[in-house]
Amino acid sequence: MIDNIEIQKILAHRYPFLLVDRVLVFEPGVRAVGIKNVTINEPFFQGHFPGRPLMPGALLIEAMAQVGGIVCGQLPEAVGKIPLLVGVNKTRFRRQVVPGDQVIITAEDLRTRQKRFGIMQTRSEVDGKLVAEAEIMFSLVD
């Protein structure tokens, strides 16, 4: 398990854009399973949407990319580099994420090429049901 303090040593993100609370499973360079606890106190709920709060899909993708960043950030070729989101393919949103949900995010390294570019297969679930999935592309930059 990786707690929030350790996550902040791996990722450059901070509140309000650090969207991973904890990592339950971690296989360096292979896969990670992280958690995002969604509360009504999230700043994005003020405007998305008043009276019917929903987690924006773009932020769900960002949370999946951050779990992917934890995986690729631990690759040997990533030492001293920052993993940046450079593309998203095959994205599907299946269900809404609302306050009180605990999102379980899985990211698996599909392939890392040229030691600077890679693709992660990601998925998010709430209560065992798929809410979103995407292929996340990243680049390692100095």
Curated annotation (Swiss-Prot):
Q: Where are the transmembrane segments?
A: none
Pfam families xrefs: FabA
EC number(s) on record?
Answer: 4.2.1.59
Q: Which reaction does it catalyse?
A: a (3R)-hydroxyacyl-[ACP] = a (2E)-enoyl-[ACP] + H2O
Q: Where does it reside?
A: Cytoplasm
Which sequence ranges form a coiled-coil region, renumbered to this chain?
none
Q: Which GO terms describe its biological process?
A: fatty acid biosynthetic process; lipid A biosynthetic process
Any idea which GO molecular function terms this record carries? (3R)-hydroxyacyl-[acyl-carrier-protein] dehydratase activity
Give the keywords, sorted: Cytoplasm, Lipid A biosynthesis, Lipid biosynthesis, Lipid metabolism, Lyase
What are the catalytic residues?
A: 48
Similarity field:
Belongs to the thioester dehydratase family. FabZ subfamily.
Protein name per Swiss-Prot or TrEMBL: 3-hydroxyacyl-[acyl-carrier-protein] dehydratase FabZ
Organism from which the protein derives: Gloeobacter violaceus (strain ATCC 29082 / PCC 7421)
